[in-house]
From Swiss-Prot:
Pfam families: Mntp. It is found in: Cell inner membrane. Keywords: Cell inner membrane, Cell membrane, Ion transport, Manganese, Membrane, Transmembrane, Transmembrane helix, Transport. The gene is mntP. One of its GO terms (cellular component) is plasma membrane. Signal peptide: none annotated. It comes from Xanthomonas campestris pv. campestris (strain ATCC 33913 / DSM 3586 / NCPPB 528 / LMG 568 / P 25). The keyword Endoplasmic reticulum does not apply. This is Putative manganese efflux pump MntP. It is a multi-pass membrane protein. GO terms for biological process: intracellular manganese ion homeostasis; manganese ion export across plasma membrane. It comes from the Bacteria. The keyword Manganese applies.
């Protein structure tokens, strides 16, 4: 696999994470660069790990993973998207109270769940990489760095979008997550038909 192919693969594998990051950035009140980089690191690490896991599982697990990876991604993204829509429909006092009562680690767990949901199909890509002449460590590093940069940019781009549309930004973020999940499900089901 050529270096250019690896870089293109890295960017292609991070597009779902980029779209989710735009939604996340739009939903955040005032994301700072630190918030954007944190999201980029979480998504980048997860996106780098999942193809390695897939690569290790190899050909034996590919049929099993292909049978349900799209349902897992759809379910996680749908649930997170619905949660964001409900939160976006709450009035300000309910949102402030919920934020006060929500532990800090939930934010990281929700971020990690979104990162996993957008990268689960990367595991299947990792399975296919097991049959190619590639160094999985290099591929994982490139995928992780591409995702880090795209998610960081996506959160900040979402911030600008969020400033333009205000409270509806969280609803938009939820819709984006649901659309990503639905697209993943549609692509897998239409490919299987």
């Amino acid at each position: 696999m050529s270096p250019l192919s690896i870089v293109l693969l890295g960017f292609a594998m991070s597009t779902d994470a980029f779209a989710a990051a735009i939604g996340k950035g739009a939903a955040m009140r005032r994301p700072r660069w630190r918030d954007a980089v944190r999201a980029g690191l979480v998504f980048g690490c997860i996106e780098a790990i999942t193809p390695v896991i897939g690569w290790m599982l190899g050909r034996a697990a590919s049929d099993y993973l292909a049978a349900f990876d799209h349902w897992i991604a759809f379910g996680l993204l749908g649930a997170l998207g619905a949660h964001m829509i409900v939160a976006g429909l709450r009035n300000e006092s309910e949102v402030d109270e919920a934020l006060r009562d929500t532990p800090k680690r939930y934010g990281l767990l929700a971020l990690a769940a979104t990162g996993f949901a957008t990268s689960i199909d990367a595991m299947a890509v990792g399975v296919s990489l097991a049959f190619l002449d590639v160094h999985i460590g290099v591929v994982a590093a490139v995928v992780g760095l591409c995702t880090l940069s795209m998610v960081t940019a996506g959160v900040m781009l979402g911030r600008a979008l969020g400033a333009l549309i205000g409270k509806r930004a969280e609803i938009l973020g939820g819709v984006i997550l649901i659309l990503i999940g639905s697209t993943i499900l549609y692509e897998h089901l239409s490919g299987a038909a």
